[in-house]
A protein has these predicted regions:
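Subset of outer-membrane beta-barrel
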Residues: 1-263
Length: 263
């Protein structure tokens, strides 16, 4: 579902933090904050940081390293605005700063994401849509592209390689959500005690094949949740499982995703 309009469901203010241990020692870290300005206006900040962990710097002459290390890092900082247009339609957009660094080489840019969330009124179906990474082409720069040359070629005895510009992966996402059981369900209304939600997304990133995700979440008494889902058409990701606890506005979530050959 559309992430840009999620803050339109905030009551008051919310803070979110998440850490994911990925393959090969890579970590994904997320920090978010959202607040309601008026009955129909919401703003938020979202920080994502990826760190590969330290790796040895190697050369052809010293393939086992020589004591120096480097890391690959990725940073995404978004400012988000969401507007409730009607009781069924929310729209949102974000301005995002991106930076990726490999040792002493980096690329950075500003891009825009847009999205919407629409309650169809048809059997409780809610549709979400987003388009991400509208922006200019980017290229890598930095000291890592410099090579040492003879002073006859350059007085500073170094030249910088010119890298080719490329487009960021424009990504289209379309999702649907339905409360099969719950206070808003068109099928089985059991109050707030039991809630079962089905969600499915289709994702089309221009640098990858089309794939999808689908899952179920059962929530008991608005306090404890269990979840399961799967990826469709993804080359490595498979089933996922998770649970959540919500007590006095403090929420704890845990999830496990099977990446098959990457285990």
């Amino acid at each position: 579902m559309c992430r840009h309009t999620h803050i339109g469901f905030v009551q008051g203010s919310d803070t979110f933090w998440s850490k994911s241990n990925y393959v090969a020692g890579i970590t994904h870290n997320v920090l978010g904050y959202a607040t309601q300005l008026t009955e129909s206006d919401f703003v938020g900040l979202h920080l994502f940081y990826m760190d590969s962990g330290d790796m040895d710097v190697t050369t052809v002459e010293q393939p086992n390293g020589f004591g120096e290390t480097f890391s690959v890092t990725g940073l995404s900082l978004r400012g988000i605005y969401t507007k409730i247009l009607t009781d069924r339609l929310k729209i949102g957009f974000s301005i995002k700063y991106l930076r990726e660094q490999i040792y002493t080489t980096y690329m950075q840019s500003f891009v825009v994401d847009i999205g919407s969330n629409f309650d169809t009124g048809i059997y409780g179906m809610v549709l979400g849509m987003s388009v991400s990474n509208f922006g200019p082409q980017v290229e890598y720069k930095g000291e890592g592209l410099e090579i040492v040359v003879d002073s006859d070629l350059d007085p500073d005895e170094k030249l910088s390689r010119i890298t080719e510009k490329f487009s960021l992966p424009l990504t289209f996402r379309l999702g649907v959500k339905n409360d099969i059981i719950g206070p808003n369900s068109e099928f089985m209304n059991m109050g707030d005690m039991h809630k079962l939600t089905f969600a499915m997304d289709g994702i089309n990133a221009l640098d990858y094949t089309v794939y999808g995700t689908m899952g179920l979440e059962y929530t008991w008494n608005n306090m404890a949740s269990v979840r399961m889902g799967t990826h469709l058409g993804h080359d490595t990701a498979g089933m996922s499982f998770g649970f959540g606890l919500d007590y006095n506005r403090i929420v704890l979530d845990y999830a496990f995703v099977n990446y098959d050959v990457l285990d």
